[in-house]
Amino acid sequence: MSMKKTLKQVFAEEQCVLAPEVYDCVSVMAAERCGYKALCLSGAELTMSMKGVPDLGVMNVEELIWATDRICDYASIPIVVDAENGYGPALTAAYNCHRLAKAGAAGVIIVDSPEVRIGGESLPLEEAVGKYRACAEALKGTDCILVARTDVKTLDEAIERCVAYREAGADMTLVFMINDIPPKDRFEAAKKIAEKDKGWKWYPDLGAHNGKSDVTLEEIAPYGYNFVGIHYCLAAALTAMM
């Protein structure tokens, strides 16, 4: 087998990468055969596949690294791994990023949430910046990129955090609250983020309503959204089996 490309190499060739969110080697096989160029190992779908429960924080880092090693070893295309909040404070998260890169992750997503999360709050900005700085340092010298995901609830605060996280060393940012915006307004929100947050961006969970996509790749690619996730693999598999 030829060496798989890094995400940086894929981004140099593709303006916008549509990436299915996979959960095992079979879902990777299906995505590869469909011609996708990169993938995301979904924390939610991996939890459902391995444990049969929703994404409620029941996966631990050892289980994630075990799965990452096997799935990335099988895959012939790069995979970004959802590492939740890094499974601990800054130094722990940094060490876990290093371990995931060694296990084959082409990218690692770290969300700015605390270890104990009640009500969806995020870490204080200064603490989150410190965590991303530590994770970026841990990934230096590897081909693994750092994706900073913010779960704050307002667009203006999300933009502020994306700029700060990028300055701390994150290669890519992800604003999850785009999913909470009415579908007809999501493109304008994506544009507003891009005005201040320059660089690689991840558009979360591309969806459709009434048969029409909320946004198109052609619309968002010029604004720096070069990675777009889609959560359909597990749902498609369940539908086919039932």
Which residues does each predicted region cover?
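Alpha/beta enzyme core
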Residues: 2-203, 212-230, 236
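Active-site beta-alpha connecting loops in nucleotide-dependent enzymes
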Residues: 209
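Structured C-terminal subdomain patch of bacterial secreted/periplasmic proteins
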Residues: 234-242
